[in-house]
C-alpha cells in the first residue's frame, strides 16, 4: 500500500510539474510538504524529499529523451520507487509508462554512506541495511 501511495504522490507531483511551464523543483517540494510521505532512505540522506524530487526530475528528463527517440508514448507518465534506489551502486529504477523500467545513475553528489561518501566515488559507497 505504501508503494502505491508513494508512486501516486510522485505521479501527482509530476503532473503538477508538467502542467505549469514555470514549475520547478522547489514548487514541487512545496506541494510534497502538504502530504505525509515517509521515504525509506538511509538516515544519512538529510533531505529525502529533495533527493526523491531530484531523481524524479532525472527520470522525467530521461523519459523526454527516450520519447524523442522512439515517440512510442503520447502521455506523460514517469515514476520512481524508494524501494528501488540502490545507494551501493548509485542507481535507481525509473518507470516510464506501464511496462518500461530504466535503471539510471544518481547524481555524483548524492550521499551513499554515513561517513560523507558520495556517488562520485562508487567504490566507497555502502549498501542500505533495512532497520538501521
Swiss-Prot record:
Q: Which GO terms describe its cellular component?
A: extracellular region
The cross-references to InterPro entries, in alphabetical order and at most eight, read: Salp15
Summary of the tissues where the protein is detected: Expressed in salivary glands from feeding female ticks. Highly expressed 1 day after start of feeding, and weakly expressed at the initiation of feeding and 4 days after start of feeding.
User: One matching Pfam family, short form?
Assistant: Salp15
Q: Where found? A: Secreted
Task: Describe how expression is induced or repressed.
Answer: By feeding.
Source organism's superkingdom?
Eukaryota
**Segments for region (CD4-binding):** 113-132
List keywords of the entry alphabetically: Glycoprotein, Secreted, Signal
Q: Which residues form the signal peptide?
A: 1-18
Q: Provide the residues annotated with a glycan attachment (glycosylation).
A: 24, 36, 62, 89, 101
Q: Per the record's keyword annotation, is Glycoprotein included, yes or no?
A: yes
Is Ion transport there in the keyword field? no
Q: Spell out the family assignment given in the record's similarity comment.
A: Belongs to the salp15 family.
Indicate the quaternary assembly. Interacts with host CD4. Interacts with host DC-SIGN (CD209). (Microbial infection) Interacts with Borrelia outer surface protein C (OspC).
Tell me the function of this protein.
Salivary tick protein that downregulates host immune system by binding to both dendritic cells, and CD4(+) T cells. Specifically binds to the CD4 coreceptor on T cells. This interaction prevents the activation of the Src kinase, Lck, and its downstream substrate Zap-70, and results in deficient activation of PLCgamma1, the repression of calcium fluxes triggered by T-cell antigen receptor (TCR) ligation, and a subsequent reduction in interleukin-2 production. (Microbial infection) Protects Borrelia garinii from anti-Borrelia antibody-mediated cytotoxicity in vitro. May facilitate B.garinii transmission in mouse model.
Its name, as the record gives it, is Salivary protein 15 Iper-2
Organism this protein belongs to: Ixodes persulcatus (Taiga tick)
